[in-house]
C-alpha cells in the first residue's frame, strides 16, 4: 500500500505534499528525494527531529492534528495530502470533519491519500475484530468506507489486504 501511495503522489501534476502524522518520515523522505516540497505535522517533537534530519528543507510542525492543523499549514495549498496510519486516532465524526477541513487545502486536481487499517463495510470490520480477539487494538478507530462514502461521494477504496486499504479523495 505504501508503494502504491508513493506512486500516486508522484503521478500528481505538482510536488507540494502535506503529510499528517509523518512519524520518522519514511514515506515523505522518499518523496522529498524526488523533489517534492514536504510540509507536515506530527504530535511528537522526537519524530520531527528524526524526519527533519532526513529532509532538511521540509517544513515540519509540531501539533495534535485532532485539534486541527497548525495555522502555517492551513495557509498553503497542496497537490497531495497524505496520512498513513495516523487518522485512526480520530473518531468517525472527527474523521468526517477533518477530511472536510482538508478539501480547501487541496490545489485544483489535488488528492488526499489515506493509507490505513480500513474496511469496505462495518461487517468486515466486525469480522476482523472477532478474528483478532485480544489482539484487536480498541484504542484505534478504523475506517469504514461505506460509512464515509455518503459524506464524500468522490471517495474511492482500494484494498491491499484483508485489513489495509488506500482511500483516495479528489478535490
Which residues does each predicted region cover?
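A short glycine-rich, Lys/Arg-flanked "PGG" loop and its adjoining helix->strand segment in the class I
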Residues: 96-108
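A conserved beta-strand element that flanks and buttresses the S-adenosyl-L-methionine
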Residues: 82
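Short catalytic micro-motifs in class I SAM-dependent methyltransferases
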Residues: 85-86
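An acidic, carboxylate-rich microenvironment
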Residues: 94-97, 147
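Conserved beta-strand/loop positions that form the S-adenosyl-L-methionine
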Residues: 20
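Class I (Rossmann-like) S-adenosyl-L-methionine-dependent methyltransferase catalytic domain
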Residues: 1-16, 24-72, 113-170
